[in-house]
């Protein structure tokens, strides 16, 4: 990664030999092949290779729309990594289906949302306010009676969202490269095709 990062900064061709232990490139020739290999990597191969969970792997893509955009990728990855089951509750917001176990991201600063950290027995040991743009978490509980969604963020902070604030959340299996600026992830998967040709510039990387 470091070697190729320097090459990118220098405006030179990156090395695609796949001999590196932390950087490799897989060529596929249509969208379905790309989606297939992404699912295989994220669900099966990479977690074993680096001893990580699929949720630790972040997909970054240049655009929101299109066959390999954020919206399509989130739908595909949700269905493969967190498929529906009898024990998982769901809630629909517009075109987005949220399901218990989903990876989500806060998309705007909210200085009023309360969070708390509790013991396994339910005793609150810390609490505060504020959830911020770019924070990522996992949906732990959907209460259809209370109409709330509980998300667990970093350091086990639990935030309870009423349904009317769900527009502040997005699925986050895949996000745009722009949205990821300033963030770090253990593992990154990036799909590129010529359908992204408008965005395919050196500064994108």
Identify the meaning behind each predicted range.
Residues 75-205:
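Conserved nucleotide-binding/hydrolysis modules and their immediate coupling elements
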Residues 1-129:
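Conserved helicase motor core of P-loop NTPases
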């Amino acid at each position: 990664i470091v070697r190729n990062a320097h090459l990118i900064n220098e405006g030179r061709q990156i090395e695609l030999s796949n001999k590196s232990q932390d950087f490799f490139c897989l060529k596929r020739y249509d969208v379905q092949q790309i989606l297939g290999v992404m699912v295989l990597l994220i669900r099966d191969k990479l977690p074993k290779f680096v001893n990580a969970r699929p949720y630790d792997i972040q997909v970054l893509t240049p655009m929101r729309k299109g066959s390999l955009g954020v919206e399509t990728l989130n739908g595909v990855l949700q269905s493969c990594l967190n498929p529906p089951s009898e024990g998982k509750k769901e809630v629909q917001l517009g075109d987005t289906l949220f399901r218990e176990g989903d990876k989500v991201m806060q998309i705007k600063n909210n200085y009023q949302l309360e969070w708390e950290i509790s013991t396994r027995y339910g005793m609150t040991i810390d609490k505060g306010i504020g959830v911020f743009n770019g924070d990522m978490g996992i949906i732990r509980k959907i209460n259809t009676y209370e109409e709330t969604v509980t998300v667990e963020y970093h350091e086990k902070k639990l935030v309870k969202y009423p349904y009317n604030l769900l527009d502040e959340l997005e699925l986050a299996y895949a996000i745009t490269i722009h949205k990821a600026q300033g963030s770090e992830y253990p593992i990154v998967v990036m799909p590129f095709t010529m359908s992204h040709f408008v965005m395919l510039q050196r500064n994108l990387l």
